[in-house]
UniProtKB/Swiss-Prot annotation:
This is Phosphate import ATP-binding protein PstB 2. It is an enzyme of class 7 (translocase). ATP binds at residues 44-51. It catalyses: phosphate(out) + ATP + H2O = ADP + 2 phosphate(in) + H(+). Belongs to the ABC transporter superfamily. Phosphate importer (TC 3.A.1.7) family. Part of the ABC transporter complex PstSACB involved in phosphate import. Responsible for energy coupling to the transport system. It is a peripheral membrane protein. One of its GO terms (cellular component) is plasma membrane. GO terms for biological process: phosphate ion transmembrane transport. It comes from Paramagnetospirillum magneticum (strain ATCC 700264 / AMB-1) (Magnetospirillum magneticum).
Length: 259
């Protein structure tokens, strides 16, 4: 269940984090703190390591052949890579929304109910109904689908599908939501709705978002971390990063000299 962590307190901490895929090193000695109750944007050119870092947080890299993670990564001070840790429970605490909307081939209702069912979060049907409705409401989708919950989630528009995936993620009461370029496949109107939703969700969740759009990072985040060639170049308040970066590489990326 979600637990209270004072806003701004470090929720996730990486120290000396390295990731190898076989012989290739994807992350080099990353030290990064993710504050609770804020949106942290990870930016940088393609292949810079931002998605690799994101996937370390809920151990999605475990599913990649040849992946090796060294160093320290903690969630509320507990080692994410402790061998005794239940990865299923970790992924309940740390939800994920992917680049392309991926609703299950189930009804809208069952898409959202799936997680609470497998984690035993509802004592009865009425409680499950409440979780589903509340999750759809938080995702800004309930008004659009309330009369057709039995219809397939795959029949929704792209933007609605992505908000359904967000509802599915928050239905298990995560503490952290990871978003890997959640708007890259959406049109501008759907993107605006998701961005508005992110702003609303940060009151209750710690959010880490990977984005190729610097404009999006500036709109939705309070902190921004800039990655380049697998290294963390600079991290700070979003306004400071975009208006007064300290590192020449950051300045070059922000101003479009490379990308």
């Amino acid at each position: 269940m979600n637990q209270f962590i004072p806003r701004g307190t470090s929720k996730i901490s990486a120290r000396g984090l390295n990731v190898h895929y076989g012989e290739k090193q994807a992350l080099h000695d990353i030290d990064l703190d993710i504050p609770a109750g804020e949106v942290t944007a990870l930016i940088g050119p393609s292949g810079c390591g931002k998605s690799t870092f994101l996937r370390c947080i809920n151990r999605m890299n475990d599913m990649v052949d040849g992946a090796k993670v060294t160093g320290s990564l903690t969630l509320d001070g507990s080692d994410v890579y402790d061998r005794s840790l239940d990865v299923v429970q970790l992924r309940a605490r740390v939800g994920m929304v992917f680049q392309k909307p991926n609703p299950f081939p189930k009804s809208i209702y069952d898409n959202v109910a799936y997680g609470p069912r497998i984690h035993g979060l509802a004592r009865d049907q009425a409680e499950l109904d409440e979780i589903v409705m509340n999750s759809l409401e938080k995702a800004g989708l309930l008004a659009e689908v309330e009369s057709r919950l039995s219809e397939s989630g795959t029949g929704l528009s792209g933007g609605q599908q992505q908000r359904l995936c967000i509802a599915r993620a928050i239905a298990v009461a995560p503490e952290v939501i990871l978003m890997d370029e959640p708007c890259s496949a959406l049109d501008p109107i759907a993107t605006a709705k998701v961005e508005e939703l992110i702003d609303e969700l940060r009151d209750n969740y710690t959010i880490v978002i990977v984005t190729h759009s610097m404009q999006q990072a500036a709109r939705v985040s309070q902190r921004t971390a800039f990655f380049h060639l697998g290294k963390l170049i600079e991290v700070g308040g979003t306004e400071e990063i975009f208006t007064n970066p300290k590192e020449p590489l950051t300045q070059g990326y922000i101003t479009g000299r490379f990308g």
